[in-house]
A protein has these predicted regions:
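PLP-dependent class I/II
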Residues: 1-195
């Protein structure tokens, strides 16, 4: 199963490869996608699954128990979005790349160790060199003392201990919002971890 919701939000020459396009995977893969991220319509909850006939029967059974269908106007809106001109995608990626580059520079300036993302709209950082017990303590400090919300990195690991030194920032905001966050982050003076 592959979640391909960020297929159009790529940077620095990164290429999207659909898992089902790989030889031998077409009948084994379930591709999940939606209009949420690419079209900034997260509240609509319109998505889809693409799979072989042998898998779709089971998907439909599970779907029937978990949700009802999306409202018709939302389905029509999704169709209009999906039929929109292709120049939308490069423009979207360029706008997010600008935000990524801006936030990355600020985070590095402040002292975060940044993992350079080539897709999506998040930046994972390492804070293991800072004087925090773990990612949760750092995230609470940032929101309570600095006024910038992050997500503890351990949330994204099947073995949470592997993410205890990481926090994730998101940049799908207006530039003015990111500039305000940058001003707050520049007041952050992290202590270095002792020993």
């Amino acid at each position: 199963m592959t979640d391909e919701i960020y297929e159009h939000i790529l940077f620095d020459g990164a290429k999207y490869i659909n898992m089902a396009s790989i030889l031998g995977m077409q009948d084994q893969n379930i591709t999940i996608n939606s209009i949420s991220k690419t079209y900034s319509l997260t509240g609509w909850r319109v998505g889809w699954a693409i799979a072989s006939v042998k898998l779709t029967g089971s998907i439909r059974k599970v779907h029937d128990f978990l949700t009802v269908g999306a409202a018709h106007p939302l389905q029509e809106g999704a169709i209009a979005a999906l039929r929109s001109d292709l120049p939308y995608y490069p423009t979207l990626a360029a706008e997010y790349r600008e935000r990524r580059d801006f936030l990355r520079q600020v985070l590095e300036e402040v002292g975060f160790r940044v993992y350079h993302p080539r897709g999506a709209y998040y930046i994972m950082t390492d804070v293991g060199h800072m004087d925090f017990k773990d990612d949760v303590e750092c995230a609470f400090y940032l929101v309570e003392k600095i006024g910038v919300a992050t997500v503890p990195g351990s949330c994204f690991y099947s073995r949470p201990e592997l993410g205890r030194t990481k926090v994730r920032f998101a940049f799908p905001k207006k530039m003015e919002t990111l500039r305000l966050a940058a001003g707050k982050l520049r007041k952050f003076k992290p202590n270095k971890k002792k020993g």
